[in-house]
Amino acid sequence: MLCLFFAKKGTLKLETEVLHEAPDTFSRTIVKGVLDGNAVANYEGLVTIKKGAKNADADLNERAILLSPHARAGAIPRLEVLENEVKAGHGATVGKVGEDELFYLATRGFPKNEAKRLIVRGFLEAFIEEFPVKEAKEIRTALSKI
């Protein structure tokens, strides 16, 4: 499951749930977000691996980047594992565009807004490649407006 969000204002609440009920199942949940202005995003993800779902393989990850000192993001990734023989992982990170990164790009002639756009593009590009062509094109168009 791939989830992507952009926001400049308002509050976004995103919830995902993945359920493994059978043996030898596989899931990857990847959530990425870019927040600017005074936007707030809260993500809650749950992966449940039921008893009997031996050899299930599950991963749940959320990553958000903040472009404004007023933007906020929170994430609660959760695993509920009721079977012993599984592979399961989860994680979440929220970070901001660093002044060092902006300075580095400024010394190479990039204005601040273009530098932010490049950093966000780098943060998302490999992820965008996972989307179907039409959606990837729409995402890149939206990125050009950041």
Language-model regions, residue ranges each:
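Conserved beta-strand/loop scaffold segments within soluble protein domains that form the structured core
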Residues: 1-103, 107-110, 132-146
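Extended amphipathic alpha-helical segments enriched in small hydrophobics
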Residues: 104-109, 114-125
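Short arginine-rich
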Residues: 123-133
